[in-house]
Amino acid sequence: MLEVIAKIREEALARVAAATSSEELEALRVRYLGKKGELTRVLRGMGKLPPEERPRVGQMANKVREELEGALKEHRENLSRREQAERLRAEALDVTLPGRPVTRGNRHPLYQILNEIKAVFIGLGFDVAEGPEVESDYYNFEALNLPKEHPARDMQDSFYITEDVLLRTHTSPVQVRVMEARHPQLPIRIIAPGKVYRRDDDATHSPLFHQVEGLLVDRRVTFGDLKGTLMAFLKQMFGEQVRVRFRPSYFPFTEPSAEVDMSCVMCGGSGCRVCSHTGWLEILGCGMVHPKVLSMSGYDPEEVSGFAFGLGVERVAMLKYGIDDLRLFYENDLRFLRQF
């Protein structure tokens, strides 16, 4: 029996030393030390031995078991270190290589245009002001010389939340809020960009669109100041070659009022389908702040005057980029958006 144990020891140690993987070591452990392993069978057969041989056989078998367990453990640790080293070599990173570029999106074309508009007016000395999109009927209409039952209210189909609260139909309420907050400070020179809401939805209208309101209030402000400001803006946005004209119009919150046209950016003013062969495109509305609006905001119209204007960001973007359908800006089509 001692010779059998010695043979098992020699064979097992040789196989353990030659093993090349953790799986192979586990198979050897089961073969020699498992419940049905070769060394286990020897120990179970000790009952058949003469009593005087049992101590020596048991002692040797236990010694071989401990030796095999130690060899398995040591070789397993060596294999683990070797496998880890190989894995680290395979996964090694060259930290001197440039990193993978981060894929970033672009600003939406409307906000690109809005940022351009803001940059031009900031360069002209205007501040940027903001106001609530959910507005009271007073600030949206009455404070802008649009009392209840005024026929001009029919020009703006509105989204009412309650009888006296609605989604603002223009950013003009911001001018009243700013004048009230800054009274009697002069000058007031602001633009108010933001979202506005009207019940329109077709190729040239959207129920949600973006508008920029402009306001300047000071002593001795004239219509000439308004013209000079808007001409400077349009030339910076569309190029020095653009021509500008002012047509008389009507807005309840300005008097006198005007529509501003510029020479068609598609044909240069020679006439085309886009400008209906007139050579001109409407771009914004403007005028001198109505005396009632000034007085309702706390200013004396005999002492101060001002001008205001409003333009649609989508309108500017459509003209600048030659787009004929407003809805393209809101359809989230990446083929369209990636062009900007």
From Swiss-Prot:
This is Phenylalanine--tRNA ligase alpha subunit. InterPro entries: aa-tRNA-synth_II, aa-tRNA-synth_II/BPL/LPL, Phe-tRNA-synth_IIc_asu, Phe-tRNA_ligase_II_N, Phe_tRNA_ligase_alpha1_bac, Phenylalanyl-tRNA_Synthase, tRNA-bd_arm. Its main location: cytoplasm. Tetramer of two alpha and two beta subunits. SUPFAM superfamilies: Class II aaRS and biotin synthetases, tRNA-binding arm. GO terms for cellular component: cytoplasm. Binds 2 magnesium ions per tetramer. GO terms for biological process: phenylalanyl-tRNA aminoacylation. Gene3D superfamilies: Bira Bifunctional Protein, Domain 2 (3.30.930.10). It holds the Pfam family Phe_tRNA-synt_N. Mg(2+) binds at residue 255. Its cofactor is Mg(2+). Keywords: Aminoacyl-tRNA synthetase, ATP-binding, Cytoplasm, Ligase, Magnesium, Metal-binding, Nucleotide-binding, Protein biosynthesis. It is found in: Cytoplasm. Its EC number is 6.1.1.20. Belongs to the class-II aminoacyl-tRNA synthetase family. Phe-tRNA synthetase alpha subunit type 1 subfamily. It catalyses: tRNA(Phe) + L-phenylalanine + ATP = L-phenylalanyl-tRNA(Phe) + AMP + diphosphate + H(+). It comes from the Bacteria. GO terms for molecular function: ATP binding; catalytic activity, acting on a protein; magnesium ion binding; phenylalanine-tRNA ligase activity; transferase activity; tRNA binding.
